[in-house]
């Protein structure tokens, strides 16, 4: 599936697919999990074959798409299927680990220094013990950044590859937009107030939804 999106010369193919995905998720939330599984399994061969340089850029495409799609996963409550709440961070983490171990992408030693500086925070939590969920919620993001720095430092991409990368970030935003548009009630039914209004964000946090829609608009 990732291969089809990358090699398609007509961007309307990916746009319409993700509009349909957003609409479908408003009817049956389980559609997202089906899409997640189909996309993951059909993309596995694409990101694990070819030369080292080809695999590197394909993994970058995969990480960009999946990390952006993590918001729709939360909105559709994919955690009911044991998909981790922070699965976007897991994708970045394991994607970077794969590149470091399998492709020997180890040029950003600054990331290694950052990781070692984060280690004390895994064991010392001030006035309480550090639990696993504390590490995942607070540290998995920075740790993923550390390993991404190690894996992606000095990676050169062409203008065409950069455009493809932007498409991979944009497609999930289109699905979120479609989902929010359908879920938003008529203005007459909205109770406007000073705080965040979940009725206009598909029932999810306004910060996250506005962020990904802002990225898509930009």
Where are these regions (language model features)?
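N-terminal signal-anchor transmembrane segment
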Residues: 2-98, 120-125
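Alpha-helical transmembrane segments of multi-pass inner-membrane proteins
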Residues: 147-148, 161-190, 204-218
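Helix-loop-helix junctions and helix-breaking kinks within/between transmembrane helices
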Residues: 23-35, 75-82, 130-137, 201-213, ...
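Hydrophobic membrane-targeting alpha-helices
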Residues: 24-27, 47, 67, 96-103, ...
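Transmembrane helix-loop junctions and nearby membrane-interface residues
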Residues: 71-74, 78, 97-100, 104, ...
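Juxtamembrane membrane-water interface segments that cap and precede transmembrane helices
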Residues: 14-20, 72-73, 188-202
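Aromatic-anchored transmembrane helix interface
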Residues: 82-95, 109-153, 168-174, 211-212
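Membrane-interfacial loop-to-transmembrane alpha-helix junctions, especially the N-terminal start
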Residues: 10-12, 49-63, 102-115, 161-169
């Amino acid at each position: 599936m990732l291969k089809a999106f990358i090699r398609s010369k007509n961007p309307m193919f990916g746009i319409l697919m993700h509009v349909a995905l957003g609409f479908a998720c408003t009817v049956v939330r389980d559609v997202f999990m089906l899409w997640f599984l189909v996309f993951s399994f059909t993309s596995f061969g694409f990101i694990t074959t070819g030369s080292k340089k080809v695999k590197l850029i394909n993994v970058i495409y995969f990480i960009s798409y999946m990390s952006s799609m993590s918001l729709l996963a939360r909105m559709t409550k994919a955690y009911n299927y044991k998909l981790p709440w922070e699965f976007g961070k897991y994708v970045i983490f394991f994607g970077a680990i794969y590149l470091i171990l399998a492709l020997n992408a180890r040029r950003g030693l600054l990331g290694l220094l950052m990781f070692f500086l984060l280690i004390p925070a895994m064991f010392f939590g001030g006035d309480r013990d550090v639990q696993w969920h504390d590490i995942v919620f607070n540290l998995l993001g920075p740790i993923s950044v550390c390993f991404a720095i190690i894996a992606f430092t000095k990676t050169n991409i062409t203008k065409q590859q950069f455009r493809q990368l932007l498409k991979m970030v944009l497609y999930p935003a289109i699905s979120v937009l479609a989902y929010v548009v359908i879920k938003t009630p008529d203005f007459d039914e909205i109770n406007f107030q000073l705080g965040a209004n979940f009725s206009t964000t598909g029932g999810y946090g306004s910060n996250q939804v506005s962020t990904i829609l802002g990225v898509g608009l930009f």
